[in-house]
UniProtKB/Swiss-Prot annotation:
Organism of provenance: Influenza A virus (strain A/Chicken/Hong Kong/37.4/2002 H5N1 genotype X2)
GO BP: any one term: cap snatching
Family the UniProt entry places it in: Belongs to the influenza viruses PB2 family.
Transcription regulation found in the keyword field: no
Assembly behavior: Influenza RNA polymerase is composed of three subunits: PB1, PB2 and PA. Interacts (via N-terminus) with PB1 (via C-terminus). Interacts with nucleoprotein NP (via N-terminus).
Gene transcribed to yield this protein: PB2
Subcellular location, principal: virion
Stated name of the protein: Polymerase basic protein 2
Length: 757
């Protein structure tokens, strides 16, 4: 109070007022603070006092010719005095108004294209629906979210090159446009922005918004996709939330969502193959999401999800250093430990070998629906503070933390044997055995854990073994908090290694991820996922396997037919026939394989019996190890549409129908492609072109006269024989075919016959 009174007295003296208003500020530190750097230190104040001046704006000199000195009301629009320190003109805000009303009208066609992200946002909001407002405590946790709907996923460098090429094509400087997306975007934008009059800098800013993912670390309680984040300020406050359904989806959210689904499907499928890592890479490289190669998306997309990270690790990309256990992301925030192998006995007296973490450590655990802070010592949980959306989510987090703590009472709570296996029928490691066991039923675990009296701490309550809240008692060391635990904010990425069973380790050898951590949740992808790999054919069921197998044979017929005659065993062992085996009744696989292989051998031995359609139809049945038996089949059974359907060895059936007239094949009523009987000029070469329609009988036979040239062959009558010179000076005996129907691929028989002794 005293000070204020003193100030009032001072201010009443005119001298004080004079000092404060007239004296120059000459304290160097203050001058430095407000004048160093280009950054405005107090933008709001600056704006206020600038706008209070008569001419706060500067403009190019040309403005004088374009704007009158005074407007209709006689107010001055620009000053004759130059802007100090530049040759620009000082202009009044009224000039802007005059220009907006009377200035030249320009085409508006480019505005929606340049400001595309804004126009799209308006549309989403217009069609979005806002529901009721609910007042309740919001458990928000900070997550790294995408704040920029509708962007491509280019890196900053890639985007910079595209922007320079589109906006400043004549500027000097090396620009490398290599990725498919860069080239497509550049071409598209150049066309869209022809004759665009909008300031290049503005266009560049807007392009950046469209091309680059911008993320922020924000407190979120609900949806984290970018179309929710753009209305975060409308949908959640400190004590309220408003329901909202976006009025449209954006491609970047769809890419994120579809990428997760594709990665999960691929990891699950790779796990059960003979070489999981090789299979995973093959699938990643041959899959497209929304028409873009999955490997390109993986390189650019920062989504952190277990399956996605396994795929990234396989490609040699860096990933986050946090590790995953029980579907929670663990990040060590302090402490350290060493790992020692230890043998422990379960409540069922089964011996488990576990890697014990010795030492004090603190972790944050972040899951989709619950988060926690965990403090632990060697095989002992010291404290767990959990928060979650509901009882179920909180229970999930508690189970994971209890198992992770490796406490003896947890291991002793196991009832029955632990024999969980993964998709490939391999036993899970002990920690995951325990986790699966208690995820199925945690009653004994919670009952045996122990309870304690609790102190009354603000924002914390206890939780009882039956998962009900309490203010007096709680599971030992466990508390439930109203506040969430923030996700790990760092975007740091580390180099990792991956073994052939898809276990991902950091450079110290700690396992960060393994296929056990990949969620089994099934979703429907927003964008079309095209798995070109035969390993993924079965994802859409038996029919898809059938159609895809035959389509593959037809697409690769040129190479398949050469292998069929020259190296059948290699052909039979092709991985593309693997998925088909699951359609053949188990008991019949070996018999069918033996039967068809024998049939094919006869075709190769007996001249003129080569039948393209039949080979295509029966080829997938040769993949199983053959059983030698005298059995003959007129039809082969495949299990599709919930029952056994027959493929006729000779002739058409609903499963496999070849239309001679159109030369098209339909499998289960679906078009599987056309059989092009004309050989590819480039591949089969002259011999096959010549020998089409001729049967090769063997080596040259002098009785049939001198070798004819290729052109002279056409004069032969059906059934007539002649010697002919082919290829590298070989002479063979041929006969012109009597029937046209068998003119299928004599060329292969040709190459075989030439080799005859």
């Amino acid at each position: 109070m005293e000070r204020i009174k003193e100030l009032r007295d001072l201010m009443s003296q005119s001298r004080t007022r004079e000092i404060l208003t007239k004296t120059t500020v000459d304290h160097m530190a203050i001058i430095k603070k407000y004048t160093s750097g280009r950054q405005e230190k107090n933008p709001a104040l600056r704006m206020k006092w600038m706008m209070a001046m008569k001419y706060p704006i500067t403009a190019d000199k040309r403005i004088i010719e374009m704007i009158p000195e005074r407007n209709e009301q006689g107010q001055t629009l620009w000053s004759k005095t130059n802007d100090a320190g530049s040759d620009r003109v000082m202009v009044s805000p009224l000039a802007v108004t005059w220009w907006n009303r009377n200035g030249p009208a320009t085409g508006t066609v480019h505005y929606p294209k340049v400001y595309k992200t804004y126009f799209e946002k308006v549309e989403r909001l217009k069609h979005g629906t806002f529901g009721p407002v609910h007042f309740r405590n919001q458990v928000k946790i900070r997550r790294r979210v995408d704040i920029n709907p509708g962007h491509a996923d280019l890196s900053a460098k890639e985007a910079q090159d595209v922007i320079m090429e589109v906006v400043f094509p004549n500027e000097v400087g090396a620009r490398t446009l290599t990725s498919e997306s860069q080239l497509t975007i550049t071409k598209e934008k150049k066309e869209e922005l022809q004759d665009c009059k909008i300031a290049p800098l503005m266009v560049a800013y807007m392009l950046e918004r469209e091309l680059v993912r911008k993320t922020r670390f924000l407190p979120v309680a609900g949806g984290t996709s970018s179309v929710y984040i753009e209305v975060l300020h409308l949908t959640q406050g400190t004590c309220w939330e408003q329901m909202y359904t976006p009025g449209g989806e954006v491609r970047n959210d769809d890419v994120d969502q579809s990428l997760v689904i594709a990665a999960r499907n691929i990891v699950r499928r790779a796990t059960v193959s003979a070489d999981p890592l090789a299979s995973l890479l093959e699938m990643c490289h041959s899959t497209q999401i929304g028409g873009i190669r999955m490997v390109d998306i993986l390189r650019q997309n920062p989504t952190e999800e277990q399956a996605v990270d396994i795929c990234k690790a396989a490609m040699g990309l860096r990933i986050s250093s946090s590790f995953s256990f029980g579907g929670f992301t663990f990040k060590r925030t302090s402490g350290s430990s060493v790992k020692k192998e230890e043998e422990v006995l379960t409540g069922n007296l089964q011996t488990l070998k576990i890697r014990v973490h010795e030492g004090y450590e603190e972790f944050t655990m972040v899951g989709r629906r619950a988060t926690a802070i965990l403090r632990k010592a060697t095989r002992r949980l010291i404290q767990l503070i959990v928060s979650g959306r509901d009882e179920q989510s909180i229970a999930e987090a508690i189970i994971v933390a209890m198992v992770f703590s490796q406490e003896d009472c947890m291991i002793k709570a196991v009832r029955g044997d632990l024999n969980f296996v993964n998709r490939a029928n391999q036993r899970l490691n002990p920690m995951h055995q325990l986790l699966r066991h208690f995820q199925k039923d945690a009653k004994v675990l919670f009952q045996n854990w122990g309870i304690e009296l609790i102190d009354n701490v603000m924002g914390m309550i206890g939780i009882l073994p039956d998962m009900t809240p309490s203010t007096e008692m709680s599971l030992r060391g466990v508390r439930v908090s109203k506040m969430g635990v923030d996700e790990y904010s760092s975007t740091e990425r580390v180099v990792v290694s991956i073994d052939r069973f898809l276990r991902v380790r950091d450079q110290r050898g700690n396992v960060l991820l393994s296929p056990e951590e990949v969620s089994e949740t099934q979703g429907t992808e927003k964008l079309t996922i095209t798995y070109s790999s035969s390993m993924m054919w079965e994802i859409n069921g038996p029919e898809s396997v059938l159609v895809n197998t035959y389509q593959w044979i037809i697409r690769n017929w040129e190479t398949v037919k050469i292998q069929w005659s020259q190296d059948p065993t290699m052909l039979y062992n092709k991985m593309e026939f693997e998925p088909f085996q699951s359609l053949i009744p188990k008991a019949a696989r070996g018999q069918y394989s033996g039967f068809v292989r024998t049939l094919f051998q006869q075709m190769r031995d007996v001249l003129g019996t080569f039948d393209t359609v039949q080979i295509i139809k029966l080829l997938p049945f040769t993949a199983a190890p053959p059983e030698q038996s005298r059995m003959q089949f007129s039809s082969l059974t495949v299990n599709v549409r919930g029952s056994g359907m027959r493929i006729l060895v000779r002739g058409n059936s609903p499963v496999f129908n070849y239309n001679k007239a159109t030369k098209r094949l339909t499998v289960l009523g679906k078009d599987a492609g056309a059989l092009t009987e004309d050989p590819d000029e480039g591949t089969a070469g002259v011999e096959s072109a010549v020998l089409r329609g001729f049967l090769i009988l063997g080596k040259e036979d002098k009785r049939y006269g001198p070798a004819l040239s290729i052109n002279e062959l056409s004069n032969l009558a059906k059934g007539e024989k002649a010697n002919v010179l082919i290829g590298q000076g070989d002479v063979v005996l041929v006969m012109k075919r009597k029937r046209d129907s068998s003119i299928l691929t004599d060329s292969q028989t040709a190459t075989k016959r030439i080799r005859m002794p």
